From Swiss-Prot:
<dbReference type="GO" id="GO:0020037">
    <property type="term" value="F:heme binding"/>
</dbReference>
<comment type="pathway">
    <text>Secondary metabolite biosynthesis.</text>
</comment>
<dbReference type="GO" id="GO:0016705">
    <property type="term" value="F:oxidoreductase activity, acting on paired donors, with incorporation or reduction of molecular oxygen"/>
</dbReference>
<comment type="function">
    <text>Non-reducing polyketide synthase; part of the gene cluster that mediates the biosynthesis of the bicoumarin desertorin. The non-reducing polyketide synthase desS first catalyzes the formation of the pentaketidic 4,7-dihydroxy-5-methylcoumarin from acetyl coenzyme A and 4 malonyl coenzyme A molecules. Further O-methylation by desB leads to the formation of 7-demethylsiderin. Then, an oxidative phenol coupling catalyzed by the cytochrome P450 monooxygenase desC forms the 6,8'-dimer M-desertorin A via dimerization the monomeric precursor, 7-demethylsiderin.</text>
</comment>
<dbReference type="InterPro" id="IPR001128">
    <property type="entry name" value="Cyt_P450"/>
</dbReference>
<keyword id="KW-0408">Iron</keyword>
<dbReference type="GO" id="GO:0019748">
    <property type="term" value="P:secondary metabolic process"/>
</dbReference>
<protein>
    <recommendedName>
        <fullName>Bicoumarin synthase desC</fullName>
        <ecNumber>1.14.-.-</ecNumber>
    </recommendedName>
</protein>
<comment type="similarity">
    <text>Belongs to the cytochrome P450 family.</text>
</comment>
<keyword id="KW-0812">Transmembrane</keyword>
<dbReference type="InterPro" id="IPR036396">
    <property type="entry name" value="Cyt_P450_sf"/>
</dbReference>
<keyword id="KW-0472">Membrane</keyword>
<feature type="binding site" description="axial binding residue">
    <location>
        <position position="480"/>
    </location>
    <ligand>
        <name>heme</name>
    </ligand>
</feature>
<dbReference type="InterPro" id="IPR002403">
    <property type="entry name" value="Cyt_P450_E_grp-IV"/>
</dbReference>
<dbReference type="GO" id="GO:0005506">
    <property type="term" value="F:iron ion binding"/>
</dbReference>
<feature type="transmembrane region" description="Helical">
    <location>
        <begin position="12"/>
        <end position="32"/>
    </location>
</feature>
<keyword id="KW-0479">Metal-binding</keyword>
Length: 536
């Protein structure tokens, strides 16, 4: 019996030794493959200077990494390379590289069509969306362009004014018998703006229960989607499929998306059938009382003949429309919500702006008897200037104009000329352009009236007007088609908050306004505010 026990013990020891050897060997293979991937990525850039942490390894394997100030390095590279007409390369969110073109080369690049340089395909890759969402279809862009007419914009404005007034109290009103409440600013703004975005997408005829459920699901989806992207970006390429398959964050993301589709897809199919059956379908979204971006998205598909011919194709079409509706929600909530948050940080830190903007809005409301009409924002140029300066100072990224080459492209506007192979990403500086003293007087100082023209009582140029020196929405043919909607949502929600509530900083002192994540810039989520209803 003792001999048999010794044999089993020896066998277990041998098995443990073999298992340990293979685990060490697999770990060694992971590190080596990751190093080779990083080396190849850097080598593919040739002589282009690289601005990053200086490592070939993924973040999770950089055991002895040194502190890296991305914004300072990008600023240094802008003055060293971009201002002298030279490109450089920077690591972006998904862990790969993009070539940063100098502003002098951008005019030619912006004229190149999406068949050669695609933003949507770049978005799918750098934001890690392709695993759970198809963002490469141009239907959302087509639908947004279809909204750029006077009637639709007016209906959007009327609906926006109503929805912003409706969705603030549940988030910002203090509990009963309390004069004030303490809230995390970013989280609260995203909660309110998410509800507004859902209402604009689904329209006023959608059942309240569905609107509430989609709002909660889409808010969670947007948050967990970013968390999943950040998580996968930490790991070597060889391990990313395993992270997607087994990590708790990725499983949560898939579960949220599954629940959203279970509620949204039947509603989308119902609307498709209704709009197909009614000859007046083209007018369904042409009044504020029935305004729905989802209906416009469906109608745009009708007009452009993106129609299914079989039940299977119909299911796929409804699923794709669901994904695009969620993409709409992300675009109409995240960027405007970020802007609203930064504006609140500014008025809490500088209360004089709150007084000025309230006085302007009181005057703007008088002609309509205090009603929030569709044209109310046009009578508030100081608010528009304040919003535009916020976009300038607190752009959500150090770079814009992200594109990926879909086929070989020669850029002769760069010296020496660049040859872009398929899969190469490019982008251009934005934040450093906004902070350049050649473009703006005292550019590092926030001036809420920087764009206000007292002579004409206008914001000049308008907040949604892009230029080579104002780039939060990029510029040229590739500029964001939803920027008009996004800026109006930001201004309307912010001014409704300012008119309805008093805000003061709950932190002992104002923390840093924003935090860097690679090339992206987000509001600091730890800023808290004390809120009370005005007039109480």
């Amino acid at each position: 019996m003792g001999a048999l026990s010794e044999i089993f013990t020896a066998g277990y020891v041998a098995l443990a030794g073999i298992t340990g050897f293979f685990l060490v060997f697999l770990g060694f293979l992971v590190v080596i493959s990751d190093y080779i991937d990083g080396w190849r990525s850097r080598r593919a850039l040739g002589d282009i200077p690289i601005v990053d942490e200086g490592s070939n390894l993924s973040p999770i394997l950089r055991w002895n990494s040194q502190p890296y100030d991305a914004e300072a390095e990008f600023t240094r590279a802008y003055y060293k390379y971009s201002k002298n007409g030279k490109p450089f390369a920077a690591r972006i969110q998904h862990g790969g590289y993009a070539i940063v073109l100098p502003p002098s080369a951008c005019r030619k690049v912006r004229s190149i069509g999406h068949e050669q340089l695609s933003f949507l395909d770049a978005l799918a890759e750098f934001a890690d969306l392709s695993l759970h969402m198809d963002v490469t279809s141009r239907r959302v862009i087509e639908a947004t362009h279809a909204c750029n007419n006077e009637t639709t914009i007016k209906n959007f404005q009327e609906r926006l004014a109503l929805e912003c007034g409706k969705h603030l109290a549940p988030v910002f009103d203090p509990p009963q018998e309390q004069e004030s409440t303490e809230l995390k600013t970013l989280k609260s703004v995203f909660a309110a703006i998410s509800a507004v975005a859902t209402a604009l997408i689904l329209g006023p005829d959608c059942p309240e229960a569905l609107v509430s459920e989609v709002t909660a699901g889409a808010t969670a989806y947007n948050e967990v989607m970013i968390q999943c992207r950040i998580l996968r970006a930490q790991y070597p390429k060889i391990l990313k499929p395993l992270v997607w398959r087994f990590s708790r964050t990725a499983r949560e993301l898939r579960a949220i998306l599954s629940r959203l589709k279970a509620r949204l897809v039947p509603e989308i199919k119902r609307r498709i059938a209704y709009l197909e059956a009614h000859s007046t379908s083209e007018n369904q979204a042409e009044s504020a009382g029935s305004f729905s971006l989802l209906d416009i998205l469906i109608q745009t598909s009708f007009k452009n003949r993106h129609l299914p011919s079989t039940p299977v194709e119909n299911d796929k079409w409804a699923d794709l429309l669901c994904q695009q509706a969620l993409l709409y929600h992300f675009k109409l909530s995240r960027a405007p919500g970020t802007s609203v948050t930064f504006m609140l940080y500014r008025v809490m830190n500088h209360p004089e702006y709150a007084t000025m903007l309230r006085d302007e809005m009181i005057a703007a409301l008088k002609p309509s008897g205090g009603n929030w009409t569709a044209d109310i924002l046009q009578r508030a140029p100081k608010l528009e200037s304040f919003n535009k300066e916020t976009f300038r100072m607190h752009d959500i990224s150090n770079f814009v104009g992200l594109r990926v080459a879909m086929r070989p492209v020669d850029l002769r506007s760069v010296s020496p000329p660049l040859h872009l192979k398929p899969g190469t990403m490019i982008m251009t500086p934005s934040r450093t352009v906004h902070y350049d003293a050649e473009h703006y007087v005292d550019p590092l100082t926030f001036n809420g009236l920087r764009f206000y023209d007292a002579t004409s009582n206008t914001c000049t140029p308008r907040v949604f007007t892009t230029s080579p020196t104002y780039l939060p929405f990029s510029h040229g043919t590739g500029s964001c088609p939803a920027r008009n909607f996004a800026t109006q949502i930001a201004r309307m929600l912010f001014i409704r908050l300012l008119m309805g509530y008093e805000f003061e900083l709950a932190n002992e002192e104002m923390p840093a306004y924003g935090l860097m994540d690679g090339t992206a810039y987000f509001p600091n989520p730890e800023v808290r505010m004390r809120v009370r209803v005005r007039g109480k």
